[in-house]
């Protein structure tokens, strides 16, 4: 009987410690997010014929830009909430002649990609673009007699004679 009470006391002391292994919140595990967050709304804004800069503005910088596949951008988003099984979403964007041609991935196809006619003009009619002035045509003109080039040509021989 004397040995029974100390054993019972030890059992009662260590019993609460065994319950710590059954608590799911201990230890705390953080949510891990990797890659680009791409939503259905962002994918719905994509239209065939968009430029690379327009796609980058809409979706953000791609996670993978492969040098061997220059006309393909990959957007990958992976999340592991609280140590649970990771979820992964992928979106691959394809370009042809630097214009968006089609997309693949875990997102529904936007309505614009089901149409047969690709969108051509993304700028409003008010926007006009004027080319930069041609500065190369001025390079071929001969400077006048009082110009710097003629002055240097005339004084070049005198300069070298004086410095020898």
Curated annotation (Swiss-Prot):
One of its GO terms (molecular function) is protein-macromolecule adaptor activity. It is found in: Cell outer membrane. Residues 111-164 are annotated as: Disordered. GO terms for biological process: Gram-negative-bacterium-type cell outer membrane assembly; protein insertion into membrane. InterPro entries: BamE, BamE-like, BamE_dom. Disulfide bonds: none annotated. Keywords: Cell outer membrane, Membrane, Signal. GO terms for cellular component: Bam protein complex. Its main location: membrane. Residues 1-19 form the signal peptide. Residues 117-140, 153-164 have a biased composition (Polar residues). Part of the outer membrane protein assembly complex, which is involved in assembly and insertion of beta-barrel proteins into the outer membrane. HAMAP family: OM_assembly_BamE (MF_00925). Belongs to the BamE family. Part of the Bam complex. This is Outer membrane protein assembly factor BamE. It comes from Nitrosomonas europaea (strain ATCC 19718 / CIP 103999 / KCTC 2705 / NBRC 14298). The gene is bamE.
